[in-house]
Amino acid sequence: MATLGHTFPFYAGPKPTFPMDTTLASIIMIFLTALATFIVILPGIRGKTRLFWLLRVVTSLFIGAAILAVNFSSEWSVGQVSTNTSYKAFSSEWISADIGLQVGLGGVNITLTGTPVQQLNETINYNEEFTWRLGENYAEEYAKALEKGLPDPVLYLAEKFTPRSPCGLYRQYRLAGHYTSAMLWVAFLCWLLANVMLSMPVLVYGGYMLLATGIFQLLALLFFSMATSLTSPCPLHLGASVLHTHHGPAFWITLTTGLLCVLLGLAMAVAHRMQPHRLKAFFNQSVDEDPMLEWSPEEGGLLSPRYRSMADSPKSQDIPLSEASSTKAYCKEAHPKDPDCAL
């Protein structure tokens, strides 16, 4: 105790964990901040265009956030099982636990939670990630996990995804992750271009880019499904149970967002051909139905509404020279202060 300054020794407690993936949390916060910013300026928009504008903003932000979120999500293929299994190597102790497996585009996430959490005089609550993204070495991460002495269920599932595993899950999911991620990045770029074009008087091309956004998302799902079905399923035995995987939330969110983009793109293309003026009105753009109609300041015109087209006049605007001189003389005699006579 003297070496500690006559104080009790301090042992660090368990590290606090964030309730969700920090990358996904950052993406959600960015888009929520953008949505809050648009809502703040919403009262400055008058008329029915306010609701149309809010609908466009919410839909666009949802599509962009969904594309980015699923690209970094670890829930493309998920599975969970409750079983009794061995705990650690060189030990005959068994535990009752919930074991979860989440496979993403860039790696796997393995969870082990005891039921109850307190067993064998310790807290059984593990959440380990092993990645194979560009610049990462999955084999090295697995070797470090062996050195740390992680529980047997975590090491067993992680070993199934190593490059040398006979299951072939590493090549299968790594290939699927690379191609799927590439398609999603292209879809995100198409979404950016769609937003730019929809803010310009080229709405039909914005609809085409929105259609391309949905097509690339559906292609991403196709690549993921094809790559993950190249090899036969590898059984994952944990104690007396078998862990089975299935498509996770990220897969279904991508499918929903892709179909939504395709439907919106097709709807805009049809509306541009059938009802172009209503489409422009929905996007709060000028509706130039007839070039002979009067100009309005709200439609981007430079003239006041009191200036009308020559077509609105029942008579020709060309006045003969003799009539003009007589009219001028009448003005000087009867209404000398009339502003029209001053012209």
From Swiss-Prot:
User: Which function does this protein serve?
Assistant: May be required for the maturation and the transport from the endoplasmic reticulum to the plasma membrane of functional DUOX1.
- Protein family: Belongs to the DUOXA family.
> What species is this protein from?
Homo sapiens (Human)
Q: Which residues lie on this side of the membrane: Extracellular?
A: 1-24, 73-183, 228-249
The record lists glycosylation at 84, 109, 121
Subunit composition and interactions: May interact with NUMB.
Cystine pairs annotated here are: none
Instruction: List the biased-composition ranges (Basic and acidic residues).
Output: 330-343
GO MF terms here are: enzyme binding
Q: Which residues cross the membrane?
A: 25-45, 52-72, 184-204, 207-227, 250-270
InterPro entries reported in the protein's UniProt record: Dual_oxidase_maturation_fac
The chain's Cytoplasmic topological domains, given as residue ranges, are 46-51, 205-206, 271-343
Region described as Disordered: 306-343
The alphabetized UniProt keywords are: Glycoprotein, Membrane, Protein transport, Transmembrane, Transmembrane helix, Transport
Expressing tissues: Specifically expressed in thyroid gland. Also detected in esophagus.
One Pfam family of this chain: DuoxA
- Location of this chain's protein in the cell: Membrane
GO biological process terms, alphabetically, are: hydrogen peroxide metabolic process; positive regulation of hydrogen peroxide biosynthetic process; positive regulation of neuron differentiation; protein localization; protein transport; regulation of inflammatory response; regulation of thyroid hormone generation
User: Which Gene Ontology cellular component annotation is one that this UniProt entry carries?
Assistant: endoplasmic reticulum membrane
Q: How does it sit in the membrane?
A: Multi-pass membrane protein
Q: What is this protein called?
A: Dual oxidase maturation factor 1
